[in-house]
Amino acid sequence: MRFTISLITLALVVSAYGSLAQSVSGVVTSDGEPVLYANVFLQGTQIGTSTDEFGRFELKNVPSGKHQLVVTAIGYAKTVKSIDIAAGEALKIDIEVKEHAAQLEEVVVSGTMKEVSKSQSAVPVEVYSAQFFRANPTPSVFESLQNVNGVRPQLNCNVCNTGDIHINGLEGPYTMVLIDGMPIVSGLSTVYGLTGIPQALIERMEIVKGPASTLYGSEAVGGLVNIITKKAVSAPLASVDMFGTDWGELNTDVSVKFKATEKASSLLGVNYFNYQNPIDRNKDGFTDLTLQNRISVFDKIDFNRKANRPFSIAGRYVYEDRWGGDMNWTPEFRGGDEIYGESIYTNRWEMFGIYQLPIKEIVNFQFSANSHKQNSVYGNTPYNANQYIGFWQLTWNKSIGRKHDLLVGGAYRYTYYDDNTPATSSGDASVNQPAITHLPGLFVQDEISLSENNKLLLGTRYDYNSIHGNIFTPRINYKWNSKNKRNIVRIGGGNGYRVANVFTEDHAALTGARTVEFNGELLPETSWNVNVNFEKKIYTDNSTFIGLDASAFYTYFTNRILPDYETDPNKIIYSNLNGHSVSKGISLNADVSWYSGLKLLAGVTLMDVSVEENGEKFRQLLTESVQGVWSVGYTFTRIGLSIDYTGNLYGPMRLPLLGELDDRAEFSPWWSIQNIQLTKRFNDRWELYGGVKNLLNFTPPANSIARSFDPFDKNVVFDNNGQVVPTPDNPNALTFDPSYVYAPNQGIRGFIGFRYTIR
C-alpha cells in the first residue's frame, strides 16, 4: 500500500514538473509562405528540431532564461532571434526568414538596359552591394574596386596618383562608367572624375565584362561599371559615415532624406575628403601620396507618379585641389622650374535624369549633361582644359506576343573639348580650334524566348560620328538555364569601336616629362569579342551555399591606338597599330556561405594581353597575367562583432623603361595588398569599425621615379637627335620619368571610423 501511494505521489510530482517545463513553438515563414524542414535549435545546446510540412516547430524542455534561437534552411539566410523564457512559460514565436543573398532574384539593368532578374539576363552581370564595399572602406569608387575579380584600379602617375579602371586587362578608356545608367564619367573625367561619389548613396554596382557598345556606345568596348544610387524612398532618413587613417586622411559621408514637395522625395549627400600631410617613406624626395582637398555634393529627387512611372532628377558638384611632387613644393612654385610639383584644380558639375512619358506604351526619356574644367600644371607644363557633354536618349520597350521583348532607342551625344595643347589648335597652331563632336545613334534589341529555358538576344546599333562617319556595332547573346535556375550558360559576341582622345585619356601625355607626337591621323579602333559564362548554384544538406561563376573571353583589336614609350625616351608616340592586339583569358568566382555565418568570396583571372606588330608579338605594358581577389567575413552574432579579411594578388607586369641602360626592373614582382577590419554593431543606429590596410606593407621600389632629384632634366645631356647621352652623373641615360608605376606607394596604415544611421 505504501509502495502504491509512493508511486502515485511520484507520478503527480513528475506530472506537475512536466506541466511547468518550458517550451518554444511557432511557425517559420518567408514572404508569408511556410518554410518546410528548416532547422530550429537553441545555440550552444542539444535542443533542436525541424519544421513540418506546414512550417511549424516545437522545442520542449527548454531551460528558463535567455537564449539564442537559430533557424537555418537551404536557400535561406541564417536567422537568429533572442528569447527570454520564464519558468513554466510556453513561448509562442513566429519567425520570418529571408532568402539567401545569393538566392535572391537580384534586379539588374546594365545588361539589357531594362530591369530584369539577374538569372533571366542573357548578358552576364556581376552585382556588388554596398555591404560588399563596406568590408574594406575607401574614400572613392576608384579604390573600392580593388577587390573585384577581373577589375583593377590602375595608378598612372607616381606623383599625382591619377588612375583609371581596367577590365580584363584593357586600359581605362575601354571602360565605361555610368551613374544610374547615364554616361557621366567619360572623356576628361576618366582621369580625375572617379572620386567624390558619396559611398553612402550607392545602392549597388553592376559590372559587365565585355563589349556593351550596342546599347551604351563607343566607350563600352572593354566593359562597363554602372553605379546605381539609392532611391530616396528606400534610403535612411539620415546617415553619417566617417573614418580616418594614421597617415592623416579623413573621409566623411553624410546623407539626409526629406520631402521636397508632397509628391517628391529628395536624397542629399555630401562627401568630404582631406589629406594634407606630406609623407616620404621611400626617401625619393617626392610625396608618397598626393595631397587632396575635395568636396562633393549630390542630390537626387524622386517624384511619385501614377502607375509608378519613373521620374527622377539628380545632380552632383565636385571641387578638388590636389598636388604631389617634391616635399619642398608650395603653391608659390606652381608652374615654375625651381621645385617640381603637379597641381590640379578640378571643377565639375553633372546632371542626369529619367522621365517615363505619360502614355500607354513604355517610353522613357533619359538625359545627362556635365561640365569638367581642369586647371593644372605638371612641373612647368600647364594643361588647362574644358569639356562639356550633353546626352539624351529615348527608348521604347514593347512585348510582342509571348516570345519577343523589343527595345528600340535613339540617342544623341554632343561633346565639346578645348585645351591649351596642339590637339585643339589649327594647322599653324596660331588659332584655337575646339574639338566638337556630334554623335547621333539608333539601336534595336530583341530578346527572344525560344523556350522556358532558352533565350536569344539580338541587337545592333548605328552611330554617325561627325568626324569619322558611319559606325555599326552588332551583338548576339544566348542563354540556357536549367528548370531550377541553378545552372546557367551564357554565350555572347559583338563588336565595338572607339575614338581616342590622347590628352583626356593618357595622363603620361600631360606630365611634361616627354613630348607628344602623332604618327599620322588616328583612326577609330575596332574590336570583336566572344565570351562564354557558366553559373552554378549548389545547396548542400548542411545548409551550405556554393555559387560558382566561370568565364572565358577573347577580344581581337584592329587599328588599336597604343602609346610608344620605348622608341624615344623623350617622346610618347601615338599611332594606329600596324597589326593587331588580342586580350584573352579565363576567370572563376566562388561565393561560399556556411550555416555558421562564415562567408567567402574569392576569384582568380588568368589572361594574356598581347600586341603583334610587323610580325613581332609582345606583352602589353602594365598588364598582369594573373589576378586573385578574396573577401572572408564572419559575424559573432551574440556580441555584434564582425571581422573582414580582404585582399588581392597580382602577377608580374611588363613595365615601361627609358632604354636599354635603364636599371629598373623590366617586370614587376608578384605583389599583394591585404586588409583586415573589425566592426562592432551596438544597435540599429551605431557601428564602430577599424582595422589595418596593406598588412604586408608592400610598396614599389624607391627608384620608381627616375631621376626624381632632377625633375626638369637640367643635368641631362642630349645629342643632336634628342637622345640621352650617358655621362658619369647619368650612366643609365635616364630622364625624369614618373610613369613607371604599378602599385600605390602608400604602405601599412591603421584606420578607424563610425557609422550612424537613422531609419
Predicted regions and their residues:
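C-terminal beta-signal and adjacent terminal beta-strands/loops
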Residues: 600, 649-657, 680-759
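Short acidic/polar hinge/loop motifs at secondary-structure boundaries
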Residues: 58-61, 166, 182-209, 297, ...
